[in-house]
Amino acid sequence: LAIEAFGEKVAGLDDKQTTIAWHFISSMIAAAVLEELVFRGYLIITGRGNLVLITSAIVFSLLFALAHPYLWAFKINEGLTINLNSGKAWFTTSFLFIKSLWFYHVRFASWNPRQSLLPSVAAHMVANLATYAIKAKQGFITW
């Protein structure tokens, strides 16, 4: 996360942040739980060897990154818009892909022999809360 924030600063993308309301933090916590249950719990293919596990982690990490509305947006009165020309959108989507791979690693690491989802949920919550803290520090939280 520090690398992402530093990268945004170096690339001049930190001023392109979206502003969020202070109470959005509850959605960020709920999203961590729900996304881990779906992506690291339900969708991942296990029990068919490491190649299948790694391949499914890569494919579902891509899906995870693309599911976040940085390269696209949907508004009821405007419909779907694609945003492929934004450096910020590509940067953030790329980091979401990397974070997703990290969450898979946390779930399937040797120190987690039961492959519990709790460590990946905790890692995801920490990442989301740190993102919230950075946005607050940078002035992108409306109180």
Regions found by a protein language model. Give the residues of each.
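Transmembrane helix-loop-helix hairpins at the membrane interface
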Residues: E4-A5, W22-W143
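Loop-to-helix transition at the N-terminal end of transmembrane alpha-helices
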Residues: D14-F24
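Catalytic phosphate/metal-binding cores of nucleic-acid and nucleotide-processing enzymes, i.e., regions
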Residues: E8-D14
